Amino acid sequence: MNLQHHFLIAMPSLQDPHFMRSVIYICEHNKEGAMGLVINKPMEQFTVETVLKKLKISPTPRDPSIRLDKAVLAGGPLAEDRGFILHSPQEGFGSSIPISPDTMITTSKDVLETLGTPEQPKNLLVALGYAGWQQGQLEQELLDNAWLTIEADTHILFNTPIAERWQAAANKLGINIFNIAPQAGHA
């Protein structure tokens, strides 16, 4: 099982405050473990523009039609001081890894220098921190019914309002997430 480019959708019974009602985009999944970004938990009063100012980055030439007031996401409880930019494929960044034909992740500062300019990737989200699982840990959480999974949808990833992503991802499975019982059993 490889869940790269899939969503993990938190079951209603998951009460961990980092992951309650979360949607996680899995960036990497292999025999060593998994890494993903929570895509529906905005950081309070922290925007892309705030990040650029803190890092003293002034993108030029600035295109005023490109909004920089998008929320920065709390990507997960690990390495919360590290930034991750999930975006549509675009060449030329120092530290980018393709995830799917429609998404790549970049951790180098050079992508930030394009934000708000015509060179900015078409679709993007910025997250601080990530979620990670050791070997076999995610698989066990799936067996424990902590998560639902579905192949990622770039419309949900980049275009669906943040507050609607959990329900929208579950709707892709054809279910109303609010109708799921808080406990699950095995037959």
UniProtKB/Swiss-Prot annotation:
SUPFAM superfamilies attached to this UniProt entry: VC0467-like
Q: Which domain of life is it from?
A: Bacteria
Q: Which Pfam families match?
A: DUF179
Please give an example of a GO cellular component term from this record. Answer: cytosol
- NCBIfam families cross-referenced by the UniProt entry: PRK00228.1-1 (NF001266)
Similarity comment: Belongs to the UPF0301 (AlgH) family.
Which named protein is this?
Answer: UPF0301 protein YE3428
Origin species: Yersinia enterocolitica serotype O:8 / biotype 1B (strain NCTC 13174 / 8081)
